[in-house]
A protein has these predicted regions:
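Enriched for short, Lys/Arg-rich terminal
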Residues: 1-7, 18, 25, 56-88
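Basic, amphipathic "hinge/linker" alpha-helix immediately C-terminal to the N-terminal HTH DNA-binding motif
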Residues: 8-12
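Active-site micro-motifs of SAM-dependent methyltransferase domains
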Residues: 14, 33, 81
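Secondary-structure boundary motif
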Residues: 18-21, 36
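Hydrophobic alpha-helical segments
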Residues: 23, 34, 49, 69-71
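A short, surface-exposed loop/turn module that caps and links secondary-structure elements
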Residues: 29-56
Length: 88
């Protein structure tokens, strides 16, 4: 099986840049784990409606979509905003 290719949108990077540094570090660590083992239980990587969701710390999530064999990361932020996005 080929490894999943990951891309992030400008909107994702803008949101990432607004996160506290400690959350950015956790997100970076979790991204490395995601590339090595996408279904590691600590990541909670799963399909949620039209999105794929992954943990970026206890109170933060990232959302992406699968497109042509790649994962396109669209957003990262607090769980409270995540709940609103996935319910749309």
């Amino acid at each position: 099986m080929n490894p999943l290719i990951h891309h992030a949108t400008k909107k994702f990077w803008d949101a990432y840049g607004k996160l506290p540094l400690r959350v950015q570090r956790v997100a970076d660590e979790n991204f490395q784990l995601l590339k090595a083992d996408p279904f590691h239980p600590s990541l909670h990587f799963k399909k949620v409606g039209r999105y794929w969701s992954v943990r970026a710390g206890i109170q933060y999530r990232a959302l992406g979509v699968r497109h042509e064999g790649a994962m396109i990361w669209l957003w990262i932020g607090p769980h409270s905003e995540y709940d609103k996005l996935i319910s749309e």
